[in-house]
From Swiss-Prot:
InterPro entries: YgfB-like, YgfB-like_sf
Listed HAMAP family: UPF0149 (MF_00346)
Source species, domain of life: Bacteria
Protein family per UniProt: Belongs to the UPF0149 family.
Any single Pfam family the record assigns to this protein: UPF0149
Protein name: UPF0149 protein VS_2635
GO cellular component terms, semicolon-separated: cytosol
Membrane-traversing stretches: none
Signal peptide, first to last residue: none
Amino acid sequence: MSETTLPDYLTVATELQSASLAVNPAEMHGLLTGMLSGGLNLADKSWQPLIFDYTNEGMGWPDRALTLAEATLKVTTSEITGSGMELSMLLPDEDASASLFDLADGVSDWINHFISGLGLVGAQLNKASDGTKEALADLEEMAKLGIDEDDDMEEQAQLLEHVIEHVKACALTIHAEFGARPSEDAAPTIH
């Protein structure tokens, strides 16, 4: 069985930019992951009007950009609802010639849009458990973090990796409380 992975950051960035969409790949993925973690219905395309409204003034996305978003959503759904407790993040990387500053900005963009995604699907965060409220508070704080150019870059890179792992843990915690689970008979019946 081959492992499905997120689309390439640079490919997604190029497509979103050429479609003149007001979102970068990290923001798109954070938004989709937040929507999933907030209880997005897994069986329909209810996410599309939400993302169209949020990123493109209600207008649909061009087919290629929408296909990349669907592929991203499919991989993320598989990861976040699976038993592996894994979550990949679509962030700037070496292939996109990203600096440590770009990566930190991407993490912040991802977190802010994750939180927006929770709101778009109407997650009842005020009724969340203490653990979930703590995870959300941690995310809000991590979204404010930045890289200090006067500090040791290698140390900052290691710290950022720890932050990324904590972001993933927080997102999984929130999904565990609010996210939809695929049903056993998720495949539609064909008559």
